[in-house]
């Protein structure tokens, strides 16, 4: 069969008739889409570059790391408030990837015989992170934003769906498999990624007097997570699926994967108060912070490892989570900021959708306040904002594409509180 000689892009493989433009050179071609992609990567300061000598991709490990201040500034663009948590995360993430750079340099020096076996080196420990904060306070968003900034693979898991190996449900190796998939099965890239495990508080031991029956999703899962955090070699089936006898498995070392775990830890405030206040005796003592988000946040800031052990986390797991960052409960003002200020703010997203229909979407100040107030009432934090806006605009988004004269859509407090239709002009 004759070889197809139709010119095609050397980068994406698209043929000349599949793109708007194809720029040809002697030995290579590039299409307009790849040019646009490269331009975007340069403008965004993408940290992946290609080595000109051997064509291998060099990650940010060979480049200058963003400083904690630069990491914090990037987080500020997407996450409102949570200043203490952002600072703690920025330092922890910076130190973690600095540790990987040191390890990579050490390995290279040994490879080139620059270091002998007896040369003393300070071994840097991994700083895994525990995030404590109410639902919808930004724990997941912080982890996702960090991974996106560093351009590393990211995988997320819900601790409540995990079981011990051998039981029905997801085991810890499934999380590593998700990370490997996010890295397009590039093992080296996956081993530099970030894993976020949410709802870690839901797998706490139910008390000091544990039942002798098998704890499928409690302490056993904590022990399995401990192996992942400490560093283990996970055997992953190629391209997903189940393990089979005589199957060649992909070996992934988790020693250098940054593990972030988070949870709301409802009831932890009582444990802390019992320790810090002499007037609070036992779990039935009145907790003043119950309806006071600010006071609850202040209590969380006083958390100690012993409180987490009493809550139900095993000591070995807590010992592997040296960085503890607490997030505050978001108030109405913060929720209003979240609606409009971040780079990917919910209001901006819907305004863009309406622009595509040649209509301008706007929210009154009272309308924004009503959205934030409703989210506060639902106790869903920032997580509940989108559903409120979606419900308010559902009928309008259904009708708008069929309307030729709609140029302006206004959402006020009546739309949110009374279910009235947005004003269309």
UniProtKB/Swiss-Prot annotation:
User: Does the keyword Protein transport belong to this entry?
Assistant: no
GO:BP terms for this protein?
A: cell division; proteolysis involved in protein catabolic process
Pfam families, per the entry: AAA_2 (PF07724), ClpB_D2-small (PF10431), zf-C4_ClpX (PF06689)
Question: Protein name, please?
Answer: ATP-dependent Clp protease ATP-binding subunit ClpX
Residues forming the ClpX-type ZB domain are 1-50
Keyword Flavoprotein among record annotations: no
Q: Which residues participate in ATP binding? A: 134-141
Query: What is this protein's function?
Result: ATP-dependent specificity component of the Clp protease. It directs the protease to specific substrates. Can perform chaperone functions in the absence of ClpP.
**What is the scientific name of the source organism?**
Psychrobacter sp. (strain PRwf-1)
Q: Where does Zn(2+) bind?
A: 9, 12, 31, 34
Molecular function terms, GO-annotated: ATP binding; ATP hydrolysis activity; ATP-dependent protein folding chaperone; protein dimerization activity; unfolded protein binding; zinc ion binding
For this UniProt record, the keywords arranged alphabetically read as follows:
ATP-binding, Chaperone, Metal-binding, Nucleotide-binding, Zinc
The family assignment reads: Belongs to the ClpX chaperone family.
């Amino acid at each position: 069969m004759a070889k197809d000689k139709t010119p095609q892009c050397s980068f994406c493989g698209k043929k000349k008739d599949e793109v708007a433009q194809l720029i040809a050179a002697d030995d290579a071609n590039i299409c307009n889409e790849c040019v646009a992609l490269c331009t975007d990567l340069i403008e965004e300061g993408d940290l992946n570059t290609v080595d000109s000598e051997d064509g291998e991709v060099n990650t940010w490990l060979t480049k200058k790391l963003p400083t904690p201040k630069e990491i914090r500034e990037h987080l500020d663009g997407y996450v409102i408030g949570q200043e203490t948590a952002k600072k703690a995360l920025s330092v922890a993430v910076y130190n973690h990837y600095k540790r990987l750079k040191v390890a990579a340099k050490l390995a290279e020096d040994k490879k080139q015989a620059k270091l002998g076996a007896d040369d003393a080196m300070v071994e840097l420990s991994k700083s895994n992170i525990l995030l404590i904060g109410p639902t919808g306070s930004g724990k997941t968003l912080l982890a996702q934003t960090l991974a996106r900034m560093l351009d590393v693979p990211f995988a997320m898991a819900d601790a409540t769906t995990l079981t011990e190996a051998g039981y029905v449900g997801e085991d810890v190796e499934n999380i590593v498999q998700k990370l490997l998939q996010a890295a397009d099965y590039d093992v080296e890239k996956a081993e530099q990624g970030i894993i976020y495990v949410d709802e870690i508080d839901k797998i706490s031991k139910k008390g000091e007097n544990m039942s002798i029956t098998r704890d499928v999703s409690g302490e056993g899962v904590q022990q399995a997570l401990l192996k992942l955090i400490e560093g283990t070699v996970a055997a992953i089936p190629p391209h997903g699926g189940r393990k089979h006898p005589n199957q060649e498995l992909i070996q992934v070392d988790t020693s250098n994967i940054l593990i972030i775990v988070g949870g709301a830890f409802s009831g932890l405030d009582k444990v802390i108060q019992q320790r810090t206040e002499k007037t609070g005796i036992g779990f039935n003592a009145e907790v003043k912070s119950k309806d006071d988000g600010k006071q609850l946040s202040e209590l969380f800031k006083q958390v100690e490892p012993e409180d987490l052990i009493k809550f139900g986390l095993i000591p070995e797991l807590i010992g592997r989570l040296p960085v503890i960052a607490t997030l505050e409960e978001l108030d109405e003002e913060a929720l209003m900021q979240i609606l409009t200020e971040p780079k990917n703010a919910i209001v901006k997203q819907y305004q863009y959708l309406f622009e595509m229909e040649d209509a301008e979407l706007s929210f009154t100040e009272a309308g924004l306040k009503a959205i934030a107030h409703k989210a506060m009432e639902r106790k869903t934090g920032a997580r509940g904002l989108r559903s409120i806006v979606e419900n308010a605009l559902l009928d309008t988004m259904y009708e708008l594409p069929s309307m030729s004269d709609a140029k302006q859509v206004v959402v006020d407090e009546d739309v949110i509180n009374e279910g009235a239709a947005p004003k269309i002009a």
